[in-house]
Regions:
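Non-catalytic signal-transmission and effector/linker regions of two-component phosphorelay proteins
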Residues: 1-45, 149-162
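Receiver (REC) domain active-site loop signature in two-component systems and cognate sites
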Residues: 97
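Acidic, metal-coordinating helix/loop segments flanking the phosphotransfer/catalytic sites
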Residues: 72-90
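Acidic catalytic/metal-coordinating carboxylates
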Residues: 74-75, 101-105
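Alpha4 helix (beta4-alpha4-beta5 surface) of REC/receiver domains from two-component response regulators
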Residues: 104, 125-144, 151-155
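Active-site residues of response regulator receiver
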Residues: 94
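Two-component/phosphorelay signaling modules centered on CheY-like receiver
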Residues: 53-71, 138, 160
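Hydrophobic/aromatic residues positioned on beta-strands within the core alpha/beta folds
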Residues: 121-123
Length: 162
């Protein structure tokens, strides 16, 4: 009887069939579909930080419907204490938040993970071109003006991740 382990490369959507000795009927086949496991691992991970819980909920639901794995925070200081290095593919960060603005938060997060991509979310009255000139921080890829439709949000997120 084999009691060791084996390694096999299984990709998204693969079915895997394994034959093993069972009791008492002898040989049995077991099919496992790894789609769900692999989709979780392969989906892009987005962190949304906005002090407005309604905004994080709407963004989260819209992005999840499009296959993204989404984590949300309403407190920028909590993000700093919970941030996981090399985990997130993209951060969506509101600029105007109490306790710490999104620009300062983004700088600190880039110190923790210099490879993460960041998009700022800003209210309609903000001048995005001025912000882009004032904060040419490495890793800041885009500015998204609120209000934004879910379709536009998803399009911008996908463009940033491609």
């Amino acid at each position: 009887m084999h009691e060791g382990t084996y390694d096999d490369k299984i990709t998204k959507g693969d079915n895997y069939e394994h034959t093993f000795l069972g009791e008492p009927t002898g040989l049995q086949k077991k099919s496992v579909n790894f789609t769900t496991i692999e989709e979780e691992r392969l989906s892009k991970v987005v962190l949304v930080v906005d002090d407005d819980p309604d905004m994080t909920s709407v963004f989260s639901l819209g992005l999840q419907d499009e296959g993204f794995e989404v984590y949300t925070y309403n407190d920028p200081l909590e993000v700093l204490s919970q941030f996981r290095r090399n985990f997130y593919d993209l951060l969506l960060v509101d600029i105007n938040m109490p306790k710490m603005n999104g620009i300062d938060l983004s700088r600190k997060l880039l110190e923790l993970d210099s490879n993460v991509k960041i998009c700022f979310i800003t209210a309609g009255e903000a001048n995005i071109e001025v912000l882009r000139e004032l904060y040419p921080t490495r890793g800041i890829g885009c500015f998204i003006r609120k209000p934004v439709t879910i379709g536009e949000l998803v399009r911008r997120v996908r463009a940033e991740l491609d």
